[in-house]
Amino acid sequence: MLLKPATPLTILLLIAFVLLLLSVISTPIVKSIPLATFDNVEYGVFGYCKAGTCTAIHIGYTTEEIENTGSTDSDFNLPSDARRSLSSILIVHPIAAFLTLICLCLAAAAHLHAPSHSPRYLLALLILLLPTLLVSLLAFLVDILLFVPHLSWGGWIVLAATIILVTCGVVTCAMRRTLVSRKARKRRIAENAEMSGQNYYNRQNAAAAALNESKPIAPEAKETFVAATQSSESGPTFATFRTNTRSSDDDRTPLNNHSDPSAQDAGYQSRIPGDPVPYNAPRDDFGNPLPPGAYNSAPRMRTPGPPGPPPPDSRVRDQYSDPRRGPPTGFAPRGRGGYPPRGGYGRGGPYGGPYGPNSRAPLTGRGGYMGPMRGGPAGPMARGGYRPQPAAGGYGNARAMGEDEYGYRGPSSRQRTPGPMAAPAAPGPAGQAIEMMPQPRHEPDAQDEVPEQQQLHAISIDNQHEPVSPTSLYSRTQSYVPPRRNWGPQAYQSSEPNLPYQPNQPRHARSQSGSMYYEDEDPVYTSRNESAVGNSGVPSVLTPGNSAK
């Protein structure tokens, strides 16, 4: 148990009370505690004892009792009458003891929290100690006046109690002063925030709160567009955001926009997908198509004879064409050689079947010749950069095919070859091309005629027609034979499908088709072209008007 400020006060008050209590219980209550002794007589607060005989307990001395003690006025400092009057004041001893007892109880209660921190409580104790001290002091003075010069130790203990009460008063005053000072300091601290450090702590807390406080993120401003119409099937639309969608024209934008403007405007238009390109258009030294101005005036087919029907319109589709199939047969990519379109080969493999009469294989790029193909109509070209010629018994005229006719759906499996066509209502000469939209046709020049024997082919050492291209993966040899060497009128092979490949048979034999076959060219061109077979002494590159490179 820790000592508290009220503990010393309690101890002092206890001692003072004991001393005052001893003075109260003196003779005749306790014969061993006399206030004064003279001539074998012991004096106390409530009587005296003489030769062992004590008087009854009462307050004060009478004249008879004083005379019976045998004392005279010369024995004490006061006369007998004064002593008799003062003897009644001895009652202050029990009063002083009682007051001291009350102060002792209050000091003991000051150990509690509420009384010890109450200035008013300590003030009440201090006020009560003051009369206690005065009563104790009065008791000591009475003893001095009555019993001097025969005062005994019982009278002196009252003096000790009085001194202790004075000390208790000082301690009580100090306790209260300490408590009041503490409360006053707290009050001043409460009134002055800078003195108490409250402002400092407030600033620290505010700074910490500012650091810990998360700053709100400003929402990103977005441009909103309210939808004009909303369908009942869709949910509620709060905002619609603008998106950049690619139009269908983006797929038709040319990749190379730095080509010759004249060639783009008047000629080939940089091969924009969907533009019709003549099937047998002349090309320059590097395999690129010439502008229309360079070849529109020239005949499209360089074979002698009267002008034939005009070329078919690009909008007219082949009667057997399928939009789900790949690009037209032998339609090679533009450039100098390179790989063919994806889709595999025709029924006869990469070399296809025999040619029809007077059909030619126009070059689509630099490199070797694709060679004839076995089987029916030739499929897409092999990796070499050339497209094969239409096989014997092919269907429809050679015409310019637009890429939009096939929908860019990629090559599909080859469909069955259609059967013979019904005879037209007004049959014309054999070999007359069917024209849905007649167009004017220019008269071919005689200088463009090239003998069939002068047309050379690229033939390897084993008499097999192969493409010769730096990027081709299917070239066997690097042997070169002039391209139009075997284009003379020869007997065609039979049109029977799936015949085994016979390299020793003639390559350009005309097939004996039935009466329902319609040739792509007029017989006039065929007859005139056959007359020039024997002139094989002049190379094809030196023939005037020849555009094949």
Swiss-Prot record:
Residue stretches spanning the membrane: 10-30, 89-109, 122-142, 144-164
Annotated Polar residues bias: 227-246, 469-480, 491-515, 526-549
Similarity annotation: Belongs to the palI/RIM9 family.
All ranges on the Extracellular side of the membrane: 31-88, 143
Topology, Cytoplasmic side: 1-9, 110-121, 165-549
Keyword terms, alphabetized: Cell membrane, Membrane, Transmembrane, Transmembrane helix
Listed Gly residues bias regions: 335-355, 365-378
Gene name per UniProt: palI
Protein name per the record: pH-response regulator protein palI/RIM9
Chain segments annotated as coiled-coil in the UniProt record: none
Recorded superkingdom: Eukaryota
Compositional bias of kind Basic and acidic residues: 314-325
Stored InterPro entries: pH-response_reg_palI/RIM9, SUR7/Rim9-like_fungi
Species whose genome carries this gene: Emericella nidulans (strain FGSC A4 / ATCC 38163 / CBS 112.46 / NRRL 194 / M139)
Predominant place of localization: membrane
GO cellular component: cell division site; cell septum; growing cell tip; plasma membrane
Protein role: Required for the proteolytic cleavage of the transcription factor pacC in response to alkaline ambient pH. Might be a pH sensor.
Origin organism lineage: Eukaryota, Fungi, Dikarya, Ascomycota, Pezizomycotina
Presence of keyword Signal: no
Membrane protein topology class: Multi-pass membrane protein
UniProt-annotated location(s): Cell membrane
Bias-annotated ranges (Low complexity): 379-388, 418-431
Biased composition (Pro residues): 304-313
Region (Disordered): 226-549
Entry keyword RNA-binding: no
